[in-house]
Swiss-Prot record:
Name this protein carries in UniProt: Riboflavin synthase
Any one GO BP annotation for this protein: riboflavin biosynthetic process
The protein's enzyme class: transferase
UniProt entry keywords in alphabetical sequence: Riboflavin biosynthesis, Transferase
InterPro entries: LS/RS, LS/RS_sf, Ribfl_synth_arc
Gene Ontology cellular component terms for the protein in this record: riboflavin synthase complex
Protein's pathway: Cofactor biosynthesis; riboflavin biosynthesis; riboflavin from 2-hydroxy-3-oxobutyl phosphate and 5-amino-6-(D-ribitylamino)uracil: step 2/2
Assigned EC number: 2.5.1.9
Organism domain of life: Archaea
Length: 156
């Protein structure tokens, strides 16, 4: 069964995370149709994601953004995150938030690596939510992280 996956990214981001996520999704399944939209900034993500769910019939959407280092960027990221949560509640569908804050990395090389890895790992989560949700259940409590190294379970 073919599933529709929406991908929304921003021109503000410094890495093309959408292309990375799309490539990974295509590797994982031939049964995924992808609809990509690009918006200017992170606060534009919620409405674009909601439109993909409601108007384009997407089963799930990835929201890819890269907040800057300034305090106002963190505020904007928080507002965008709240908007994404509201859009999920209004549509009863998942929007996977994939934010990479510029200050998470020590330099541009690490930022590029982190953005690509986080986009790929969240694309895998999208695949599992759509096609193999039981896998996610088996991974509960494992301390999995998207991007940097997994934390692992608190107790073995």
């Amino acid at each position: 069964m073919t599933k529709k996956v929406g991908i929304v990214d921003t021109t503000f981001a410094r890495v093309d995370m959408a292309s990375i996520a799309i490539k990974k999704l295509k590797e994982l399944s031939p049964n995924i149709k992808i609809i990509r939209k690009t918006v200017p900034g992170i606060k534009d993500l919620p409405v674009a994601c909601k439109k993909l769910l409601e108007e384009e019939g997407c089963d799930i959407v990835m929201a890819l953004g890269m907040p800057g280092k300034a305090e106002k960027d963190k505020v904007c990221a928080h507002e965008a995150s709240l908007g994404l949560m509201l859009a999920q509640l209004m549509t009863n569908k998942h929007i996977i938030e994939v934010f990479v804050h510029e200050d998470e990395a020590k330099d541009d090389k690490e930022l590029d690596w982190l953005a690509k890895r986080r986009a790929e790992e969240h694309a895998e989560n999208v695949y599992y939510l759509l096609f193999k949700p039981e896998y996610l259940t088996r991974m509960a409590g494992k301390g999995l992280r998207q991007g940097f190294e997994d934390a692992g379970p608190a107790r073995e």
